[in-house]
From Swiss-Prot:
GO molecular function terms noted in the UniProt entry: ferredoxin-NADP+ reductase activity; flavin adenine dinucleotide binding; NADP binding
Catalytic activity annotation: 2 reduced [2Fe-2S]-[ferredoxin] + NADP(+) + H(+) = 2 oxidized [2Fe-2S]-[ferredoxin] + NADPH
Details of cofactor binding: Binds 1 FAD per subunit.
Annotated positions binding FAD: E37, Q45, Y50, V90, F124, D285, T326
Protein name: Ferredoxin--NADP reductase 2
Keywords from the named record: FAD, Flavoprotein, NADP, Oxidoreductase
Organism of origin: Bacillus velezensis (strain DSM 23117 / BGSC 10A6 / LMG 26770 / FZB42)
Claim: NADP is one of the keywords in the record: yes
InterPro entries noted in UniProt: FAD/NAD-bd_sf, FAD/NAD-binding_dom, Fd--NADP_Rdtase_type_2, Ferredoxin-NADP_redctase_2
UniProt similarity note: Belongs to the ferredoxin--NADP reductase type 2 family.
Signal peptide: none
EC number(s) per entry: 1.18.1.2
């Protein structure tokens, strides 16, 4: 296992929207910041589940696409040189005798003066395709996450799933891919009615009610064999890529073993956003307090509170109330 011996001022666990804003704000307070994210990309559920959906309750935006909001947050954070660690799930956090936190992930050990957890509903993993041969194609042309739509340009793509994410991906891929098919085990899709209407009015090949039965190909998937649910029909389609979108399973997992005060699967915090462990803060949907409302907008307010109090924890002489951002950037 690798070890990064550098001790950061703030380590943010979770790279969703609140985590990204937390990292930006940490930079504003001149803190060294590291983000640890379990998924292959930043953006959390916004990027992984509904990148094309509009969000209407972020201040200053009448409406904004989820992925556009993530892109804006990444651009905002890029003002500072933050360290980003992807595909690392934090397994344990321990406050050592010297007050420094030791964070152990599935692949690396990290050290930090303070920790701010912004992990939403906890770590979430994709529901995987339950076919015997599926695992051998992961990392090749079987995908659970999509980082760049352009990688599918001119290719034949099949999407498995019937929810919002599956329908969104199929519609987004239609103008880019050579051919798009969506396969769902039921005749009716669970996605938003407007999205389903757009799907049926598109050139996407809709195959229902079918389930995947076999993946054919040596090094990569070349054919997808489908079987009709409660029927005898079979379909074989030639594909270059398979995207599985069966949803995600989220849980606090090992977070429950870190000594934090947890109430109804949320971490209890004070008005400073500090947990029962000094120097360990939480913001966003992962935390709870009296009157807590779980919204992205709320998390954006909690992030500066957590950062400013983390700064004061590290340096008692530091101002909890910061300067206005205009005085910091406009010189």
């Amino acid at each position: 296992m690798q070890e990064d011996s550098k001790v950061y001022d703030i380590t943010v666990i979770g790279g969703g929207p609140v985590g990204l804003f937390t990292a930006f704000y940490g930079g504003m307070r001149q803190a060294s910041v590291k983000i640890i994210e379990s998924l292959p990309q930043l953006g959390g559920q916004l990027s992984a589940l509904y990148p094309e959906k509009y969000i209407y309750d972020v201040a200053g935006f009448p409406k904004i696409r989820a992925q556009e909001l993530v892109n804006n947050l990444k651009e905002q954070m890029a003002k500072f040189d933050q360290t980003i660690c992807l595909e690392q799930a934090v397994e344990s956090v321990e406050k050592q005798a010297d007050g420094v936190f030791k964070l152990v992930t599935n692949s690396e050990t990290h050290y930090s003066k303070t920790v701010i957890i912004t992990a939403g509903n906890g770590a979430f993993k994709p529901r995987k395709l339950e076919l015997e041969s599926a695992e051998q194609y992961e990392g090749k042309n079987l995908h659970y996450f999509i980082d760049d739509l352009n990688q599918f340009a001119g290719r034949r793509v099949a999407v498995l799933g019937g929810g919002d994410s599956a329908v969104d991906w199929a519609l987004m891929l239609e103008p880019i891919a050579k051919e798009v098919s969506i396969i769902h085990r039921r005749d009716k899709f669970r996605a938003h009615e407007h999205s389903v209407e757009n799907l049926h009015n598109s050139k996407v090949n809709v195959l229902t009610p079918f389930v995947p039965a076999e993946l054919v190909g040596e090094d990569r998937i070349e054919q997808l064999v489908l079987e009709e649910v409660k029927g005898d029909r079979k379909e074989i389609i030639e594909i270059d890529d398979l995207i599985v979108n069966y949803g995600f399973v989220s849980s606090l997992g090992p977070i429950k073993n870190w000594g934090l005060d947890i109430e109804k699967n949320s971490i209890v915090v004070k008005s400073t956003m500090e947990t029962n462990i000094e120097g360990f803060f939480a913001a966003g949907d992962i935390c709870t307090y009296e009157g807590k409302v779980k919204l992205i907008a709320s998390g954006f307010g909690e992030a500066p509170t957590a950062v400013n109090n983390a700064k004061a924890y590290m340096d008692p002489k530091a101002r909890v109330q910061p300067l206005h951002s205009t005085s910091m950037f406009e010189k």
